[in-house]
């Protein structure tokens, strides 16, 4: 985000997963997340292991249950902070060390364990899912004496794929209209994303809209972003933007 400015934020995410059996009922995965803020030198690295189990309710409906657990490390370079007692009033020179007691007891890095779970109900056209992260509400304070629990994160999502036939005057492939929605909430913060996409045989074209449904001030904006996207599939390779 903001790659050319002082507020640059870089996020890297990777994953690998696979089935444990031939019928695809059980699967495991591994995820990696690294988030870095240039302007604060704050960094979060997390690695999680995941397990999912699929239940065939009947010939059409399926229920997938999942759990994820892992370890996270937060790092904040307090040495990059400039405090008032480091500035010499007469000359304006800056010293490297601060005697400010407010920094006493702070740790530059610490780690914690985290756990999440979720479920997904779906058939060939419809899906509905719920996920709850940070079930253990770990303490994320940078001091040993403080208690700052990480609030649980709730995500509720759903979608439906409509078969709208073919556009013979443009494409001869059948076209599906995909409609999706996702509500997220953590503590007093919330967000609602919804959108749609046309799914052709080899590519997808659509857009999503992000809303702030519960504004916390008179200056809060309901519409926060409009996000178009597209993808193309070549055999088993998918390229999206």
Spans of features found by a protein language model:
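Subset of outer-membrane beta-barrel
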Residues: 1-241
């Amino acid at each position: 985000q903001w790659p050319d400015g002082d507020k640059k934020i870089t996020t890297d995410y990777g994953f690998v997963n696979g089935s444990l059996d031939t019928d695809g009922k059980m699967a495991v995965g591994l995820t990696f997340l690294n988030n870095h803020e240039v302007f604060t030198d704050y960094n979060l690295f997390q690695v999680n292991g995941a397990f999912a189990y699929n239940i065939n309710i009947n010939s059409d409906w399926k229920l997938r249950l999942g759990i994820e657990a892992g370890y996270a490390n937060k790092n904040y370079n307090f040495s990059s902070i400039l405090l008032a007692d480091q500035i010499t009033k007469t000359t304006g020179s800056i010293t490297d060390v601060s005697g400010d007691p407010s920094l006493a007891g702070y740790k530059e890095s610490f780690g914690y364990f985290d756990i999440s779970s979720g479920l997904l109900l779906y058939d060939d056209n419809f899906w509905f899912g719920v996920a709850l992260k940070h079930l253990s509400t770990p303490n994320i304070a940078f001091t040993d004496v403080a208690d700052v629990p990480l609030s649980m994160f709730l995500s509720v999502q759903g979608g439906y794929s409509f078969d709208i036939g073919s556009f013979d005057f443009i494409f001869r492939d059948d076209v599906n209209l995909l409609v999706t929605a996702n509500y997220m909430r953590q503590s007093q913060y919330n967000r609602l994303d919804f959108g749609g996409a046309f799914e052709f045989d080899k590519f997808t074209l659509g857009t999503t809209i992000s809303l702030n449904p519960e504004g916390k001030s008179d200056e809060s904006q309901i519409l926060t972003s409009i996000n178009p996207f597209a993808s193309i599939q070549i055999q088993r390779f998918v390229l999206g933007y």
